[in-house]
Regions:
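Append "and, occasionally, other polyanion-binding protein interfaces
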Residues: 25, 37-39, 63
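Well-ordered alpha/beta subsegment
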Residues: 95-131
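Charge-rich, low-complexity N-terminal segments
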Residues: 1-31
Length: 131
């Protein structure tokens, strides 16, 4: 289970009563993102969880999940510009992170797109290729 690489503070952040409708979505997103590599990790900051290629604080970020509000989760992915699917949104105001190009907004009841695992792998590969 990749939850051992998910910052326990992130799980705690989405464990309050208001997060019940989105907690499993967050855990599922994290599973997709962390399963791209045995080295990938997720670290909570104040309002987002950054998914990195490895565990050092300075390691590249390939995805970010904003958990600012329990009404929605916004996930940004570092996809190559020519490979950003039409189903993803461009960078959203106030939710910018360097290198992220495609954004997915999930609210209670929304399904994670079937392609999300592929997008996560592509984002991870894209960031690793920048080194």
């Amino acid at each position: 289970m990749t939850n051992t690489r998910l910052d326990p503070r992130a799980i705690q952040k989405v464990s309050g009563p208001s997060w019940v409708p989105l907690k499993q979505t967050f855990l599922d997103l994290s599973e997709y993102l962390l399963s791209v590599s045995d080295e990938a990790t997720a670290r909570l900051t104040t309002i987002y969880v950054k998914y990195q290629v490895a565990s050092e604080a300075s390691d590249p970020v390939f995805a970010v999940a904003w958990v600012k509000t329990s009404r929605e989760i916004v996930v940004g992915l570092a996809l190559p510009g020519e490979r950003v699917p039409d189903t993803l949104k461009p960078p959203l105001a106030g939710l910018l992170y360097p290198g992220l190009t495609g954004y997915l907004v999930l609210r209670a009841g929304d399904q994670i797109p079937a392609e999300f695992g592929d997008w996560a792998r592509t984002a991870h590969q894209t960031v690793q290729g920048r080194d």
